[in-house]
């Protein structure tokens, strides 16, 4: 496929699960980051086709990382999907206000995740 996805989560288990789903079912190249600060620097260097990012993380949360990524000219149009256990309306609204393209809740359904990513990656 040739697409690159940046996976961002402070949980090693979640990163491994997401990476396994994407590699086995899509062949996407996956790069990872453990928090929002790391995500910004990795995104600038790696130039991913899409960012899949947790919200609640140490050092910098996903909302703030999303806002800062949108300030980077190279990342302004990169699709960002936020992932969290919280699905309350105000929390989802905060996600969209931070600049994300979409928002999904955990636990992640593999089929739903792949369908969503393929939609944003034009597949």
Regions found by a protein language model. Name each.
Residues 108-117:
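C-terminal output helix
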Residues 12-31:
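Two-component/phosphorelay signaling modules centered on CheY-like receiver
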Residues 57:
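Receiver (REC) domain active-site loop signature in two-component systems and cognate sites
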Residues 86-87:
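Short, conserved "switch-loop" micro-motifs in signal-transduction and mechanochemical regulators
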Residues 32-50:
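Acidic, metal-coordinating helix/loop segments flanking the phosphotransfer/catalytic sites
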């Amino acid at each position: 496929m040739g697409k690159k996805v940046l996976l961002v989560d402070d949980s090693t288990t979640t990163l491994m699960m997401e990476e396994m789903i994407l590699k086995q079912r899509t062949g996407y190249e996956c790069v990872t980051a453990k928090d929002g600060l790391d995500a910004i620097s990795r995104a600038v260097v790696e130039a991913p086709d899409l960012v899949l990012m947790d919200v609640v993380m140490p050092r910098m949360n996903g909302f703030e990382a999303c806002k800062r990524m949108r300030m980077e000219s190279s990342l302004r149009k990169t699709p960002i999907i936020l992932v969290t256990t919280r699905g309350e309306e105000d929390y989802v609204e905060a996600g969209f206000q931070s600049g994300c393209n979409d928002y999904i809740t955990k636990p992640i359904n593999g089929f739903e995740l792949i369908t969503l990513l393929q939609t944003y990656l034009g597949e």
